[in-house]
From Swiss-Prot:
Protein's cellular compartments: Cytoplasm
Name of protein: Xanthine phosphoribosyltransferase
GO cellular component entries: cytoplasm
Pathway recorded for this protein: Purine metabolism; XMP biosynthesis via salvage pathway; XMP from xanthine: step 1/1
Name of the coding gene: xpt
GO BP: any one term: XMP salvage
Statement: the UniProt record of this protein carries the keyword Transferase: yes
Recorded catalytic activity of this chain's protein: XMP + diphosphate = xanthine + 5-phospho-alpha-D-ribose 1-diphosphate
Length: 190
């Protein structure tokens, strides 16, 4: 997606050979016009997938997920990282390790929002080692629902997440596939 590539080149900051900071438009400050384009593109890519729900993890996946849900006309559920007084009943949970935050979290979704008839599209801001995607897939399976595919805003292709999801037979559509961050330069798989 050229608009996303351009935004990454202009406003992304390479912090190391492993870390790309995109807080100027995706995961701190949000560019609504770009999110709309991202939602439109995911909706186009998954128009034939029979999606009934979208699942993401709070917080950075919410903006692209909501825009995709708006375009597809389906609800968006975000897995919560923090306990809530209102989120208590027989939760669907999975453990996820965050590469950038170097922490382990338990994420949870209420079983009231997913059921066995759902075809679920996973939307996330990044795909690196695939731990967040695997956690969401686990929750979807716990509900007896079907994974319709995964929509990733930025994939770090040099890490193993994509290969693992591919080997499990999941459909993965990434809007920007980063080949390398070496030398402080973002290079894409075209």
């Amino acid at each position: 997606m050229e608009a996303l590539h351009q935004k990454i080149r202009e406003e992304g900051i390479v912090l190391s050979d492993q870390v790309l900071k995109v807080d100027a438009f995706l995961n701190h400050q949000i560019d609504p016009a770009l999110m709309q384009l991202i939602g439109d593109e995911f909706a186009r890519l998954f128009a034939d997938a029979g999606v009934t729900k979208i699942v993401t993890i709070e917080a950075s996946g919410i903006a692209p997920a909501v825009m995709t849900g708006l375009k597809l006309g389906v609800p968006v559920i975000f897995a919560r990282k923090h306990q809530s007084l209102t989120l208590t009943e027989n939760l669907l949970t999975a453990s996820v390790y965050s590469f950038t935050k170097q922490t382990e979290n338990t994420v949870a979704i209420s079983p009231r929002h997913l059921n066995s008839s759902d075809r679920v599209l996973v939307i996330d801001d990044f795909l690196a080692n695939g731990k967040a995607s695997q956690a969401l897939i686990s929750i979807i399976k716990q509900a007896g629902a079907t994974v319709a595919g995964l929509g990733i805003v930025i994939e770090k292709s040099f890490q193993g997440g994509r290969a693992e999801l591919d080997s499990q037979g999941y459909r993965v559509e990434s809007l920007a596939r980063v080949k390398s961050l070496e030398g402080g330069v973002v290079s894409f798989i075209e």
